[in-house]
Swiss-Prot record:
GO terms for cellular component: cytosolic large ribosomal subunit. This is Large ribosomal subunit protein uL3. It comes from the Bacteria. Part of the 50S ribosomal subunit. Forms a cluster with proteins L14 and L19. The gene is rplC. Belongs to the universal ribosomal protein uL3 family. Keywords: Ribonucleoprotein, Ribosomal protein, RNA-binding, rRNA-binding.
Length: 210
C-alpha cells in the first residue's frame, strides 16, 4: 500500500449531511499514479518510492534523464513527480505499479501539501501581521517595519528578520483533513475543509501521522 497519492485540486463546494449540517469540502483529482522508481536500503541507503501523476506531456518537454526513467517504468507521461518515504508493510510496491485513489476510505485522516497562491510583494503589516503605528495625531510611522537591527553590534541584519517581501507561492501543509467520500470511477477524493493553492494546482495527499 502506498503512503500517499498525487493529484490536482478541482475546487471547493459543499455537501449536506443527513441531519442538515453543511460541510465545506474540496474535490481533488487524485491519481492514477505510477511507481516511477523504487528505492531500497541496499541500493540507495533508504526505503522510498517515487510516484508520477499520469497525464499527457509533450515529449520535447521532458529531459533525457527523466525520459529514460519513465520509459524504464513503462510510464508514458508524468509531469508531476514526488517521493514518499516508506515504512513497514510497503514492500509490495515495485516499479511500474499503479496507485489509485481506492486506497483511501471515508473517515480517513490525510495531510495535503500544496503551493499557496502567490500574492506578490507585501509589507510587514500584511505579510507578518505587524500592528503598525498611529494613523493620525502627527504620526509619521504608519505601516513601516521599524528598526531591523542594532548599530555597532552586531552591525548586520540577523537572519530570519521579518521584513517585507514575496507573500505566498510557498509550500503549505494542511494536516488531519477528513476524507468525506471517494469516487473510484472518476478518481476523485473529497476532503473536508480547504486545501492550499489555486484550482488546477498540484497537490500531494498522504496519510496523517499525527
Amino acid at each position: 500500500m502506498s503512503p500517499g497519492i498525487l493529484g490536482k485540486k478541482i475546487g471547493m463546494t459543499q455537501i449536506f449531511r443527513p441531519d442538515g449540517q453543511v460541510v465545506p469540502v474540496t474535490l481533488l483529482k487524485a491519481g492514477p499514479c505510477m511507481v516511477v522508481q523504487r528505492k531500497t536500503p541496499s541500493t540507495d541507503g533508504y526505503d522510498a518510492v517515487q510516484l508520477g501523476l499520469v497525464e499527457f506531456i509533450k515529449p520535447q518537454r521532458i529531459n533525457k534523464p527523466t525520459a529514460g526513467r519513465l520509459k524504464k517504468a513503462g510510464v508514458e507521461g508524468a509531469k508531476f513527480m514526488r517521493e514518499f518515504t516508506l515504512g513497514p508493510g510497503s514492500d509490495d510496491l515495485k516499479t511500474g505499479d499503479q496507485v489509485l485513489v481506492d486506497q483511501f476510505k471515508p473517515k480517513d485522516k490525510v495531510d495535503v501539501v500544496g503551493i499557496s497562491k502567490g500574492k506578490g510583494f507585501a509589507g510587514v503589516v500584511k505579510r507578518h501581521h505587524f500592528r503598525g503605528g498611529e494613523g493620525s495625531h502627527g504620526s509619521m510611522f504608519h505601516r513601516a517595519p521599524g528598526s531591523i537591527g542594532a548599530s555597532s553590534f552586531p552591525s548586520r541584519v540577523v537572519p530570519g528578520m521579518r521584513m517585507g517581501g514575496h507573500l505566498g507561492n510557498a509550500q503549505v501543509t494542511v494536516r488531519n483533513l477528513e476524507v468525506i467520500d471517494v469516487d473510484t470511477e472518476d478518481n476523485v477524493l473529497v476532503v473536508k475543509g480547504a486545501v492550499p493553492g489555486p484550482n488546477g494546482g498540484y497537490v500531494l495527499v498522504r496519510r496523517s501521522k499525527r
